Amino acid sequence: MTDLTPREIVSELDRFIIGQKEAKRAVAVALRNRWRRKQLADDLRDEVYPKNILMIGPTGVGKTEISRRLARLAKAPFLKVEATKFTEVGYVGRDVDSIIRDLVDAAIVETRARMREDVKARAAKAAEDRVIEAVAGRDAREQTREMFRGKLKRGELDSTVIEIDVADTSNPMQMLDPTGQGQMGMMNLGEIFGKAFGGRTQRRKMTVAESHDILMNEEADKLLDDEVVKATALEAVQQNGIVFIDEIDKVCARSDMRGADVSREGVQRDLLPLIEGTTVSTKYGPVKTDHILFIASGAFHIAKPSDLLPELQGRLPIRVELRALTEEDFVRILSETDNALTLQYKALMQTEKVGITFTEDGIAALASIAAEVNRSVENIGARRLYTVMERVFEELSFHAPDRSGEEVTVDAAYVEKNLGELARSSDLSRYVL
């Protein structure tokens, strides 16, 4: 759990997301409240519930990115889902309880990876011993083993093919799992038979280099207690979990709509207990959702936030509106963020020994075209920059291997040459950009 202050959290988010100050402050306070709750006495701690957030704003303005970066900062189990994937219980499709099961699965993987790091040194030694045994033989003398150990550390054995026994992770009874039911809280037939067939190994040929990760993971897992991994992951989900529900506006039954809105309101009703706090059965054990932070988001172009069920509105007390991005924002996105597209394209072309330099007027031209196409065709926010950049670099990307050693300057003239005609024709840009 992070102990960053709200100001520090916003500062970290500013490195990747331009603007949207109100949304950043809301999620920063929500995350800090997690830390504050941890400092309380036990009896009061259970009474303090997270204030769930509803983000309202057009597509491509940073709603998902804010949540994803927040989860990384928090080092918390995080899951992003689309509300449209789910149906009311009783209809064909996924029910909302699978959100928590997926979150637990993600937490188990995350926790196991973190715990593997803690035993990495011991696992590396055990993996090394297995490789040396495979190369030198089980009965090799200590002197021979040490000679091969030296070669292994120097990388001289990387291309040597060895034959080792590795765990067989396949489950021959997987077909017995009912379709879509593999995540239920009950143990299914496939799992029962899988356990009966568990512990099997299979002999495989591979190079020493290829065996490294496989043996490291196997040896690390031998040093880990599965029950501790499970308990730690469940605790992390219950206390620090973050669920981002996108496209919540798509499950609104609009007030002016008539007819059978199959399971739209039903999905909202099913979400109510999940967000309010309930216990969900998973194959790792029951999970209480009382203290999981839910962030819902939607564009609300057609539906309005007031079209959500009143009870659901009450469970999303913090509302933040994200504004549409302007041309100035696009300039800043291309030049100020740590993961700017300009830096990405520079690095990609550098792999082909082609140097790229972006001028200020070149960046301004890219931003101007993206903003113009958003205005004239469809506003998809910062995602338009991907399309524009890809089109500008299409020719260079194709011929880059033949242009090794060249320096290319991306200025306004270069952008105009590669994109000008397309941007000017609204009919063309509708289909191409």
Swiss-Prot record:
One biological process term in Gene Ontology: proteolysis involved in protein catabolic process
Claim: Nucleotide-binding is one of the keywords in the record: yes
Domain of life: Bacteria
Subcellular location: Cytoplasm
InterPro entries recorded: AAA+_ATPase, ATP-dep_Clp_protease_ClpX, ATPase_AAA_core, ATPase_dyneun-rel_AAA, Clp_ATPase_C, HslU, P-loop_NTPase
Main location: cytoplasm
UniProt keyword annotations, A-Z: ATP-binding, Chaperone, Cytoplasm, Nucleotide-binding, Stress response
Gene Ontology cellular-component terms listed: HslUV protease complex
Binding, ATP: I18, G60, V61, G62, K63, T64, E65, D246, E311, R383
GO molecular function, one term: ATP hydrolysis activity
Subunit and partners: A double ring-shaped homohexamer of HslV is capped on each side by a ring-shaped HslU homohexamer. The assembly of the HslU/HslV complex is dependent on binding of ATP.
Family: Belongs to the ClpX chaperone family. HslU subfamily.
Function, in words: ATPase subunit of a proteasome-like degradation complex; this subunit has chaperone activity. The binding of ATP and its subsequent hydrolysis by HslU are essential for unfolding of protein substrates subsequently hydrolyzed by HslV. HslU recognizes the N-terminal part of its protein substrates and unfolds these before they are guided to HslV for hydrolysis.
Name of the protein in its database record: ATP-dependent protease ATPase subunit HslU
Encoding gene (name): hslU
